[in-house]
Amino acid sequence: MKHVLIFSFLLAILWNPVTSHAQLISQTQRNQTTQVLDIVYLKSKTLRSEYLKVESELWKPLHESRVASGEMTAWFLFEVTYPYGSNRDYDFVAINIFPGTESLKNQSLEGTRAMFKKLNPNVDTEAIFEKTDASRELVKGEVFTFIAGTTPLKLREPSDFMQVNFMRVPDVAAKYYESLEKQYALPLHSLRVKAGDMQNWSLLKRTLPLGVDYPYQYITMDEYANWEMLTKEPTPGLWEQAHDNLVEQEIWNKFIEVRDLVRQETWRLVSYVIKQDAMVRTRGR
């Protein structure tokens, strides 16, 4: 059945050439309301406290400056709680949220050096980079675009716990998958938020890098105020409130046909920088 759905979307895709990286960036630049997330996966090399000290003392002031200027919307730092163990690829995740792709041009080494110099002309950037490299390994970075959610990311503080679901979706079924999430999942999660079952839900699409070697194309983020909220039993009757007489299993079968859950991780919030009511707000180390 999955192949039938994919074939039907292939017919439509034939009339729409694949968007190149340059076209993608150009389109996003024309729509500056798009929320772009630069997600950075990090592996600490030192004690946890030593790594967090580097983030707090060397990098957080820079994030605060960029958020205050409007170049960056927010910065979040999460610690991976599940999976745990020495064999996991990364144990911290930083999320840089931008109002569009234009700000991504400053994510290079030279761009970062220039931003530090702008903040403090006398700063020794090489010493900062050396201390940073000694404290952690940058495993990989990916760029995602916010597709849908119960509350736009730029309008709220991050939750203390987040379950992150990595989804594999064929390119030819991408638009259909997004429509399923918006039509069925979003109304349900909105009711879950009102019922106190969760705090927020978001759907993100990976836009850079692209290619068949990457095992997932989408991420959904389920956010919870605390561990108790994450593990509580769901409030009964929410599906019926959201979708009346629709049979729940029949709808979820539509999801199963076009996407696979590659893996799920649990992240715990460590620190953040956001801008609310024209003020920069921070928490954590």
Regions found by a protein language model. Give the residues of each.
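Positively charged n-region of N-terminal signal peptides that target proteins for export
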Residues: 1-4, 23
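Compositionally biased, low-complexity segments enriched in small residues
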Residues: 2, 15, 124-128
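Bacterial N-terminal signal peptides
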Residues: 7-16
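Short S/T/G/P-rich N-terminal loop/turn motif that feeds into the first structured element of a domain
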Residues: 22-116, 126-285
